[in-house]
């Protein structure tokens, strides 16, 4: 009887040990799994990539988990990159310039083609303002340091005005829309899909979009640490972004139906915003570096950033193997 009891005890002990070993191995595997934290906004290709779920499947093969965090604008997203809450994200042209000026250790990874109609200066439907020149002395809402900041500067210059000729009111998109609806500001400089939403829901009138003034590239950026330690993951990410962009070109209806619920807007508004974007991500070209340098120099001259910047110093150069796969 004592022998049977001992045998049962040993069996139970070995079973417990095996279970503990399995749990420990599973925990170790979980601990070893890396995480790619992506910051996105209510526009652009990353929203589509999130909707499709192809990146998660691709990176799961490499033991990489993907986590997504939404931001209201580019400056806020780049602050997230700077403090280490995300590893990779998308912004317009101006936020990286302000981030570099503030000392953020970020790298430009890739860009989308120009999308100049995807941002605009809007006025209320009944506004007496008919031209950019008539903004002199007026209150203009914008998200400071965002892509539309440069659009406003260029539009004013083109109309013969200086930045000091208007009163900028710096507000994130939701607050800016509220101020626009209340009549607290005379104009609002904004990007899609907020732009399309204001046009469709408020019948806001476009005073000037980016056509002939700005490129309005989407830029993909990463922390220097993440890009340098994980070049293969970054390469896969750019490849997937490009693939989704190519898919969108021939599947606007499906893309719209996938994105609309994610951003909480109607299919009509979403489709217009999707149509206005540029698709076809590429690693950063010398021409794009030159264009970004011009933007940086403009903000330095306006004393909106404190020092001269060199854009080429913050461009990610993918390893040859990664570049060949693109």
What are the language-model segments listed below?
Residues 1-34, 323-326:
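Short, low-complexity disordered leader/linker segments with a strong preference
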Residues 29-162, 169-170, 186-190, 212-214:
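Short, glycine-/small- and polar/acidic-enriched structural segments
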Residues 45, 137-142, 185, 223-226, ...:
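Second-shell loop/turn segments in exported
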Residues 45-46, 115-121, 204-205, 216-220, ...:
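Small-molecule pocket liners
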Residues 56-64, 281-288, 311:
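Short, solvent-exposed loop/beta-turn-alpha elements that line the ligand-binding surface or hinge
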Residues 94, 168-169, 173-261:
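Pocket-lining segment of extracytoplasmic ligand-binding domains
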Residues 228-304:
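Secondary-structure end/capping motifs
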Residues 297-326:
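Conserved C-terminal helix/tail region of periplasmic/extracytoplasmic solute-binding proteins
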